[in-house]
Amino acid sequence: MNQSSRGRDAAKPSEIPARGWKEILWRVYGEISEDRVMLIAAGVTYYLLLAMVPGLSALISIYGLFFDPASIQDHTQMLSGIVPGGGMEILEEQMERLASGGRTTLGLTFAISLAIALWSANAGMKSLFEAMNVAYEENETRGFAKLTATSLAFTLSGIVGIICMIGVVVVVPGVLNLIGLGSATEWLIRIGSYVLLFVIASLAIAALFRWGPDRANAKWQWITPGTILSVFVILAVSALFSWYVANFGSYNETYGSLGALIGFLTWIWLAVTILIVGGELNSEMELQTARDTTTPPESAMGSRGATVADTVAGTPEAGDMAASPDTSARRGTRPRLSAGNLAFAVPAALLLAFLERRSRQR
């Protein structure tokens, strides 16, 4: 078999031909079941739910240093089209309760409260790191201090990013009025808010893919496809799910007073599932090439510090984890059919058809 037709010498994802992408997507399809992506996402959802209130507490504490805490609800309405209605009710209720204490003042009490909130919210971030280890076929070997420092940095960066986004929404209207664009303010703010949300989400997910798993850092080009897939699909699925809950959802009829919470949990679970699948895509892309996909200096295979960078799919060393469609069939380990597989298979088939058509046109 011509190895170049499969992308074995690809230095970046765009150099992988259609045949190579077919193998990548087939393996991702199988890994959804093999890595129990939906079960892992459910576990992460649990930890994120536990981290939600401490995270909001830390957010409002820092937000209160610059703005009136009671105004935070007015500035988070941009999420109403993405977070399901029940989820927004839960978030708004918690924000109202936490903001009732008034404006934050610097002091020992504030520092202790913020530290406790960040530490509690940090458990949710660590669960995302573990999900990335699953996607990239890694085992966690970082010591307690290094892992905690990294996850705390992510947690604090996420909170600061949200505050910056809210700050833009607060400051921009005044600037637009000063330059004579007052009548277009509302429209510009709405468009700008969603663009800013997309940019921040992209940066956050790319950072998670790069520094979340316990491995040598991947080059940015080997992170980008999974990031783009995750952001677009999460935003699209979130909007569709919010619309479904608003128009057809019957969570309250089925679960009563727990309906809003169940809908919120389902939304988080869907988002985390998509995020892990994005990591699986990046992982399988690295398995497709024999070139070093980690940051410089270049290293020989076997000494790159990352399982998927040190392995090529379809080789004996790769094992069942990285088996190509041909070797999977011979070993009797073809991916099992499941709802998660089907949810991935339809868009994957459309993408394959597009890639093959583009290949023929060339």
Predicted regions and their residues:
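Membrane-embedded alpha-helices and immediately adjacent juxtamembrane helical segments
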Residues: 1-362
